[in-house]
C-alpha cells in the first residue's frame, strides 16, 4: 500500500455507512444525513447500493466465526445501504462519537443523542457503520469507491475544501470547492 502524504492540518477521511434499517425509512435516512451536515462534515462522495453477499463477506471477514457474523452479513445485504466518504479535521473520531456505541442499549444510556442512541434498534440494526482507524478508513473507502484516489484527493481537492469557500450541492449530495462568485468547480474522482 502506498503512503499518502498529508499536511499536518489536512482534513481526514472516513467511511460512513447508513445501514438498511435506516435507508428503508426516508425520514430516518434524512435525519442521519442532516446530522452529517450539521456537524460540519464535508461529503466528498456518496452512493446508494445493494450490497452483494460476497462483497459484504469480504468486508466483514475479520468477524468471520463470531456469533453475530452470519446475522450481520444477512442484514447488511437485505436492502439498500448508503455509503459516504466524509471529511473533517478529525473525521474518524468525530463520526464515531456522532454514531455512539455499537451496542444500542449502551448508546441509549450513555449517548442518548447519538445516532445509535436515538435511532438504533438492535446491536446489528444500529443504523450506521464507521471506520475505526486511518488504515481501515483507506481500506473501506477503496471497497465502496474503487475509482476514488485518496492520493489524488489529498493533492487536488483537499486543499480547496479545507481552505474554502465550499458549496454543498443537494442535487449531487456532495460538497465542492466554490469559485469566487459562487460558481462551483467540478468535483473529480
Swiss-Prot record:
Any GO CC annotation of this UniProt entry: mitochondrial inner membrane
CDD domains, sorted: NDPk6
Keyword hit for Metal-binding: yes
Residues binding ATP, per UniProt: 19, 68, 96, 102, 116, 126
Top-rank taxon, per record: Eukaryota
GO annotation terms (biological process): CTP biosynthetic process; GTP biosynthetic process; negative regulation of cell growth; negative regulation of mitotic nuclear division; UTP biosynthetic process
A molecular-function term among this protein's GO annotations: ATP binding
EC number(s) recorded for this UniProt protein: 2.7.4.6
The keyword Metal-binding appears for this protein: yes
Pfam families membership: NDK
Active site (catalytic residues): 129 (pros-phosphohistidine intermediate)
EC class of the enzyme, as a word: transferase
InterPro entries listed in its UniProt record: NDK-like_dom, NDK-like_dom_sf, NDPk6, Nucleoside_diP_kinase, Nucleoside_diP_kinase_AS
Reactions catalysed according to its record: a 2'-deoxyribonucleoside 5'-diphosphate + ATP = a 2'-deoxyribonucleoside 5'-triphosphate + ADP; a ribonucleoside 5'-diphosphate + ATP = a ribonucleoside 5'-triphosphate + ADP
Cofactor needs: Mg(2+)
Keywords tagged on the record: ATP-binding, Kinase, Magnesium, Metal-binding, Nucleotide metabolism, Nucleotide-binding, Transferase
Family as reported in the entry's similarity comment: Belongs to the NDK family.
Chain's role: Major role in the synthesis of nucleoside triphosphates other than ATP. The ATP gamma phosphate is transferred to the NDP beta phosphate via a ping-pong mechanism, using a phosphorylated active-site intermediate.
Protein name: Nucleoside diphosphate kinase 6
Encoding gene, per UniProt annotation: Nme6
Amino acid at each position: 500500500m502506498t503512503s499518502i502524504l498529508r499536511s499536518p492540518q489536512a482534513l481526514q477521511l472516513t467511511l460512513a455507512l447508513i445501514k438498511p434499517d435506516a435507508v428503508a425509512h426516508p425520514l430516518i435516512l434524512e435525519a442521519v444525513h442532516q446530522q452529517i451536515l450539521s456537524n460540519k462534515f464535508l461529503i466528498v462522495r456518496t452512493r446508494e447500493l445493494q450490497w452483494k453477499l460476497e462483497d459484504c463477506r469480504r468486508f466483514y471477514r475479520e468477524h468471520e466465526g463470531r456469533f453475530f457474523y452470519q446475522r450481520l452479513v444477512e442484514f447488511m445485504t437485505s436492502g439498500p445501504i448508503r455509503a459516504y466518504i466524509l471529511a473533517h479535521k478529525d473525521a474518524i473520531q468525530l463520526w464515531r462519537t456522532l454514531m455512539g456505541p455499537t451496542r444500542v442499549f449502551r448508546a441509549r444510556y450513555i449517548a442518548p443523542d447519538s445516532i445509535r442512541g436515538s435511532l438504533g434498534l438492535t446491536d446489528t440494526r444500529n443504523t450506521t457503520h464507521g471506520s475505526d482507524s486511518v488504515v481501515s478508513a483507506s481500506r473501506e473507502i477503496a471497497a465502496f469507491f474503487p475509482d476514488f484516489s485518496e492520493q489524488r484527493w489529498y493533492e487536488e481537492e483537499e486543499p480547496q475544501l479545507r481552505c474554502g469557500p465550499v458549496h454543498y450541492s443537494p442535487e449531487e449530495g456532495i460538497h465542492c470547492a466554490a469559485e469566487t462568485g459562487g460558481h462551483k468547480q467540478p468535483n473529480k474522482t
